[in-house]
Amino acid sequence: MCAATGVAGAVAALSCGGTAQAMVNGVPVADAETAKWVATIDPVGDGSLFDTGQCGGALVGPDRVVTAAHCVDSVDPGRMKVHINARVLSRDPGVERGVRGIVVLPGYALEPSAVDPDDADLDSARNDLAVILLDRPVTDIPVLPVGVSRPAPGTPISFFAHGNTGKAVGFEDPEYRNDVLHRGDFTVMSHADCVAGLSPVVDDRSVMCAQDRSERPAASCFRDSGSPAVTEVDGRPELVGVFSFGGEVVGKGCGPAPQGFADPIAFRDWIFGPLDELEPYPAAAPVVHRTGESLHCDLPHWDEVRGRLPGTVSVGWANRTWMGKLPLLTPIAGADTADLPIADAARQPGDAVCVVSAANSGGVIRTVSEGVDVHD
């Protein structure tokens, strides 16, 4: 379910929240007036959106975007940028906004896959929704209304995303993801059919399933997570799903299988509520000082306007390397205090970074220092 590599694994991309998938066999959206409310979430906040955009979302109010909770899990809200109506990621970034706060839906949890319970990339999820509050309203793009009742089995829905294509090409090849916004057409399934096709662990209350059963079926792949699914009601689109997980939970990543969408309709009142339980928001990144043969990490202060104080804070260290323009963090074993011997940091490739995680009832964030060269 992760955008680049497993968050829980030995190597994690700074840009990766929890899970993130993308579309196979979708069709390009040619009409510039269609789906202008699609959001693209860039947790890195720097560089080409084609390279660093990781998840989708939907503008449901002038100042708020709905996405998947796993897209913002363990991400630094202070670095994140949200792009509305980015039609072509490489050259049309759309309307850009910063983040003034994030709230994860209470009860959000990952559900281990029966295929491999220890592989977090195969997890399904429950209550996989989050709201991103924008630093400034978006007033020139119509919002996407949230539906009022879950579509019945057999209802057609359309899914809009910029995810990976599933083609067997390298990360550096532009064919690996959909630069242009794509659409996939699915049909809503019953819960029983979804469980039969995916896993016994599908939460009916918070997950709606759909599948494309055509001869050339559209399916999810990496970087589609959080992207919106809509149905037409009285001639207008309404949000009925937020992409959460797909065939990867049964070992069919980027392949034809039922698709699990978090149900925003079930939590409509929460989405448009006061959202007081904001996740922690670092006022700045941690800072690393080099003193003799050791490194010391100064923890960040916390912005109490854009977030609530954390209930727990932990410190770790990692070596940072790069996959293209995406940073990859390899944790340094046993490094769980603010001080680190340089000799320990120099055992693996890459510069050393301090990683601070903080959590409260609104969610979990992770903020990372600038790198320090430990191999000179």
Label every PLM stretch briefly.
Residues V44-D46, H70-S74, N85-S90, D135-T139, ...:
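Acidic glycine-/aspartate-rich tracts in secreted/extracellular proteins
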Residues E96-R97, A125-E215, P264-R268, R366-G371:
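Chymotrypsin/trypsin-fold serine protease catalytic domain
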Residues M23, A39, G53-Q54, A58-V72, ...:
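C-terminal subregion of chymotrypsin/trypsin-like serine protease catalytic domains
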Residues P77, G154, P349-V353:
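Extracellular Ig-like/FN3 beta-sandwich strand-entry sites
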